[in-house]
């Protein structure tokens, strides 16, 4: 009889909270297939380091590729727009990472549905970013209701630093795995100098063949040009 009472008391003790209809399963970065639970707020400044050893970068021209070197265009702002859905913006290019209906990555000047990606956490701390809008749906009869019949299109950078088309990607491929890296001291110095509006450092640069004119606020270089020039100078000083 005493054993029965002990069992009943153990059932009444507080344990794991019951999952109600609106409860979400929270997982940390080590959780398999987990999602980040933050909503909105300040963007995370990160560099997305692909398992192929390239940093994802967004150019002012709209081009997307990978860089092996320290580049201002690889400094990104990752903002959660919904639970598990993020927008990725280049800090100095001012453009959003986007994927079109053909699976091509590009840097969009304006935010749209093509700029939203599903962020998932995988083992070893790597993340994947899949287009929220586009995916491959099987045409097999009856497969429409099966989640396994859909194949997501992932952000991917191959071993040559070139973006892969979404429909050719897989979640388990190295080219689809990204490690969010915190900015180092060189990145912070680059951000500080560019945001403080310091004059560009002296050195050789591509100059138009015309008469020298006094530099006015209207003739100042755009921030993305300063970013490129400053990145080159920091690389040279590091060596």
From Swiss-Prot:
It is linked to Deafness with labyrinthine aplasia, microtia and microdontia: Unique autosomal recessive syndrome characterized by type I microtia, microdontia, and profound congenital deafness associated with a complete absence of inner ear structures (Michel aplasia). Interacts with FGFR1 and FGFR2. Affinity between fibroblast growth factors (FGFs) and their receptors is increased by heparan sulfate glycosaminoglycans that function as coreceptors. Changing residue 6 to P: In LAMM; probably impairs secretion. One of its GO terms (biological process) is neurogenesis. One of its GO terms (molecular function) is fibroblast growth factor receptor binding. Residues 225-239 have a biased composition (Polar residues). It comes from Homo sapiens (Human). Glycans are attached at residue 65. This is Fibroblast growth factor 3. Belongs to the heparin-binding growth factors family. The lineage of its organism: Eukaryota, Metazoa, Chordata, Craniata, Vertebrata.
């Amino acid at each position: 009889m005493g054993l029965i009472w002990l069992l009943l008391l153990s059932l009444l003790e507080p344990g794991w909270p019951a999952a109600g209809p609106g409860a979400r399963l929270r997982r940390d970065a080590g959780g398999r297939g987990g999602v980040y639970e933050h909503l909105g707020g300040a963007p995370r400044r990160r560099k997305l380091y692909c398992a192929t050893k390239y940093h994802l970068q967004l150019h002012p021209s709209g081009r997307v590729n990978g860089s092996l070197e320290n580049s201002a265009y690889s400094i990104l702002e990752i903002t959660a727009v919904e639970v598990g859905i993020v927008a990725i913006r280049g800090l100095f290019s001012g453009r959003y990472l986007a994927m079109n209906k053909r699976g091509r990555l590009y840097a969009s000047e304006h935010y749209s549905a093509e700029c939203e990606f599903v962020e998932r956490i995988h083992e070893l701390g790597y993340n994947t970013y899949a287009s929220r809008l586009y995916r491959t749906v099987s045409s097999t009869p009856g497969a429409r209701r099966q989640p396994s019949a859909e194949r997501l299109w992932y952000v991917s950078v191959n071993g040559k630093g070139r973006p892969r088309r979404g429909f050719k990607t897989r979640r388990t491929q190295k080219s689809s795995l990204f490690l969010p890296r915190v900015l180092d001291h060189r990145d912070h110095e680059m951000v500080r100098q560019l945001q403080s509006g310091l004059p560009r450092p002296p050195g050789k640069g591509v100059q138009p063949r015309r008469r020298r004119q006094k530099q006015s606020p209207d003739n100042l270089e755009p921030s993305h040009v300063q970013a490129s020039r400053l990145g080159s100078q920091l690389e040279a000083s590091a060596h």
